[in-house]
A protein has these predicted regions:
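Active-site rim/adjacent substrate-binding subdomains
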Residues: 1-106, 118, 124-128
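Short alpha-helical catalytic segment bearing the HExxH-like zincin motif
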Residues: 106-114
């Protein structure tokens, strides 16, 4: 070994997961919700995207994003609006995880976190 030489630590590249399997993980997280919550999510588009937009990335690395008006903030004039949308970002989640088990759990927590925002729960109030 050369004097002063420090080997680079192995670079973590995340876990591998096909888009199809990742979408199944997201769908499974939604399907395991109690039925009463699933019914409330019927008009919410839950989508998988590879990466967040540049604007979202600049605001702080995101694993998911809720876009819409939380249920509790909708007034009587709430109509003629696009459906709410929850985006789950595949590549950041893959990079953040070391194992398939960890990926399943992080996908589940991210889905629950964004659904929490749909129900009007702030980041500070969410336990995850």
């Amino acid at each position: 070994m050369l004097s002063g030489y420090q080997p680079r630590p192995a670079r973590h590249r995340g876990v591998r997961c096909t888009r199809w399997r990742f979408e199944r993980l997201v769908r499974h997280a939604c399907e395991t919700l109690p039925t009463r919550f699933q019914k409330l999510l019927r008009n919410v588009a839950i989508v998988v995207e590879d990466l967040p937009s540049r604007v979202v990335r600049l605001e702080g690395g995101a694993l998911g994003l809720y876009e819409g008006t939380p249920i509790g903030q909708r007034g009587t004039d709430y109509s003629m609006v696009l459906p709410d949308k929850i985006s789950i970002y595949r590549l950041p989640l893959l990079r953040a995880c070391h194992t398939q088990r960890e990926l399943r759990e992080e996908v589940r927590l991210t889905v629950l976190h964004e659904i929490g925002h749909y129900f009007g729960i702030s980041d500070e109030e969410l336990p995850f």
